[in-house]
Regions:
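A generic fold-level signal
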Residues: 1, 38, 116-118
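Short, surface-exposed interaction loops/tails
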Residues: 117-157
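Extracellular/periplasmic head regions of type IV pilus-like filament subunits
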Residues: 51, 55-127
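Membrane-proximal N-terminal amphipathic helix
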Residues: 32-59, 86
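N-terminal single-pass transmembrane signal-anchor helix
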Residues: 1-27
Length: 157
């Protein structure tokens, strides 16, 4: 009875190792795309909530959330206690079901950002696979979030 030679076993192990590395690379890419899809979905949901808020109150600056009626900027879900964060206030008022959290957020100052005025808003995120060019997010005159805070994607209204 003859078994496998050492060379044959090494070839089989090398092939299995090569195939497993391809599978793991594909899984990592899928996870990255899923996290970016969640970020885009979160921004759209907050944008809709802000539009509904503006429709009722005439401003995109959420009262009781720290920006004041003249506008402001900050972290969307920073856990302020008084005043509360913008996202938490939108939840409190019934415009959002839950506070959106970036999938890889490690602290309240590493997630989504918001800038608002009475007439418009911009929401910022950091995508792992951003588009080749950042969308035009200078609607509110804020142009440094991409460099100052590492944000590479935004939506504006």
């Amino acid at each position: 009875m003859r078994g496998f030679t050492l060379i044959e076993l090494l070839v089989v192990i090398a092939i299995i190792g090569l195939l497993s590395s391809v599978v793991f690379a594909s899984l990592n890419s899928a996870r990255t795309k899923a996290r970016d899809a969640k970020r885009l979905s979160d921004l759209r949901q907050v944008g809709i909530a802000l539009a509904l808020y503006q429709d009722q109150y005439g401003t995109f600056c959420v009262a009781g959330a720290g920006a004041g009626s003249s506008g402001g900027m900050g972290w969307l879900n920073y856990p302020y206690t008084n005043p509360v964060g913008v996202a938490q206030q939108l939840v409190n008022l019934g415009y959002l079901g839950a506070v959106p959290v970036d999938p890889t957020q490690t602290s309240p100052t590493s997630g989504y950002m918001v800038y608002c005025t009475a007439t418009n808003f911009t929401l910022y995120a950091t995508l792992e696979n951003p588009p080749p060019a950042m969308p035009n997010c200078t609607l509110n005159g804020i142009t440094d979030y991409d460099t100052a805070y590492g944000k590479n994607y935004c939506i504006s209204q």
